Amino acid sequence: MKTLNRRDFPGAQYPERIIQFGEGNFLRAFVDWQIDLLNEHTDLNSGVVVVRPIETSFPPSLSTQDGLYTTIIRGLNEKGEAVSDARLIRSVNREISVYSEYDEFLKLAHNPEMRFVFSNTTEAGISYHAGDKFDDAPAVSYPAKLTRLLFERFSHFNGALDKGWIIIPCELIDYNGDALRELVLRYAQEWALPEAFIQWLDQANSFCSTLVDRIVTGYPRDEVAKLEEELGYHDGFLDTAEYFYLFVIQGPKSLATELRLDKYPLNVLIVDDIKPYKERKVAILNGAHTALVPVAFQAGLDTVGEAMNDAEICAFVEKAIYEEIIPVLDLPRDELESFASAVTGRFRNPYIKHQLLSIALNGMTKFRTRILPQLLAGQKANGTLPARLTFALAALIAFYRGERNGETYPVQDDAHWLERYQQLWSQYRDRVIGTQELVAIVLAEKDHWEQDLTQVPGLVEQVANDLDAILEKGMREAVRPLC
C-alpha cells in the first residue's frame, strides 16, 4: 500500500500565503481543512507552511508526506443523518522546525505573498518567558518567536504598510488576539526595537481574537487498518473530527472578502466582539454538559450518547437549555436556538464515545462558571429558581458521594472539595447533619462561589428538597417530574 506523497497522488498545490504555528491534530482538522475547502471552491489560492514551535521530533514531520493528509469528518448532519466524509487535504505545503531550520523560518518573512498567521500553541503558548532575547535562535515562547519574525518582515520590506499580517491565534484563552499583541509589544519594547517597528505593528497588522469550536478526535488508532483499506493508501497523519465546527473571528469586516468567505460561506463569523459567542458556548454547550453529567451518571448511564438516547434524560437536558438557559442569554433567540440544536446533535454523535466521568472533572468549578450565572439570572428575572438548573446542583452534590448502586467511582476535583465532601457525607451518614445543613455548608463557601449562595432566596431549601428526593427515590424517580 502506497504512502501519501505528491508524486503518487498528484493534485493542486498552492502558493505559500499562510504561516501556521502548530502541527497538531486540531489545526489540521479545523483551519487547514477550511483553507482546503476555500482553495477548492474559490480563488483563495493559499498554501500553508506549518512551523513546529517546540523542539521535538515526535510526531514525524508532515513533510514526510509532502504536507498531504486525510481528514475524516464524522457525526450527525443538519438532517440528523450519520455521515462520514474523508477528504485529502492539499492546503499544507510543508512543515519546518523552528529549532533545526531557523534560517528557513526567518526566510518566511521575506515572501511578499505571506498574509496570514494562524496558531495553536496550547493555552500555555501565549505567555511571557523572561529569558527570551532577540538574538536567540529561536526564543522559547511563541510570542517572542512571532516578534522576531515580524521584525524580520518589517526590516526586509522597509516598514511597508501593505506587508503587514493578519494574525489569528486559535489558543483557548479569552481574547487571545489581544493577549498575543500585548506580548509582542512587550518583547519589542524589552528588546529596544525601533519605535518605527512598534508603529508598524499597530498600523500594518491585525491581531484578531477568536473562538474556536470543534471536537477533534485525532488519529483513529483503533480503526486505522480498516480506514486505510477503504482509502487505498497509508496515511500516518489521519485526523478525525466531528461534523460541527464554528470559527468566530473578532476582526475587520474586510476579512470575509480576504478569506473569500463571500464566495463560499463556511461556519465562520467575522464579528466586532467575541464575548457573546463565548458566553453562548459556555452557557449552552458547556452548561448542558455540566447539568447532564451528574444526573445521567447517577441514572446509570456512562456516555453522553447513551444519555441523549435516553428519552427522560434527553428531555431534562433539552428543557434546561430551551426553558432555563436560552431565555437569559444576550443574543437573538433564533441564533441561540440554532446553536442549541447543533449542540444536542453533537451530543448524539455516534462516532464519539464521550465518557460522563471524564467530563465530571472539576465539577464544582464548572458549575460556578457554566451554570450558576444562568441560575441566578433566571431567579432575578422571574422571581423563581429555574427548576432544572437547581436540580443539577443537587445532583452534583449527590455525585460527590462517589458511589453508584453500591459501587464506588473516582471523583476528580481539587483537594479542598474532595476532603470537604468526604467529611460532609460521612457526617450525613452518621446523622450528625441532615441534607439542609449539608447543602447550606456547600452553598456558604464564599471563596468558591465568589458570594454566599445561602442568601439567594429559597436556594438552600430547593436544593435540599431535590437532594432528599435523589437520596430517597434514586435519580430516575427524582428527575422524572422535570423531564
From Swiss-Prot:
Record keywords, A-Z: NAD, Oxidoreductase
Sequence intervals crossing the membrane: none
Known catalytic reactions: D-altronate + NAD(+) = keto-D-tagaturonate + NADH + H(+)
EC number in record: 1.1.1.58
Signal peptide: none
Pfam families: Mannitol_dh (PF01232), Mannitol_dh_C (PF08125)
Record InterPro entries: 6-PGluconate_DH-like_C_sf (IPR008927), 6PGD_dom2 (IPR013328), Altronate_OxRdtase (IPR023668), Mannitol_DH_C (IPR013118), Mannitol_DH_N (IPR013131), NAD(P)-bd_dom_sf (IPR036291)
Superkingdom in the source lineage: Bacteria
HAMAP family: Altron_oxidoreduct (MF_00670)
UniProt similarity note: Belongs to the mannitol dehydrogenase family. UxaB subfamily.
NCBIfam families: PRK03643.1
Descriptive protein name: Altronate oxidoreductase
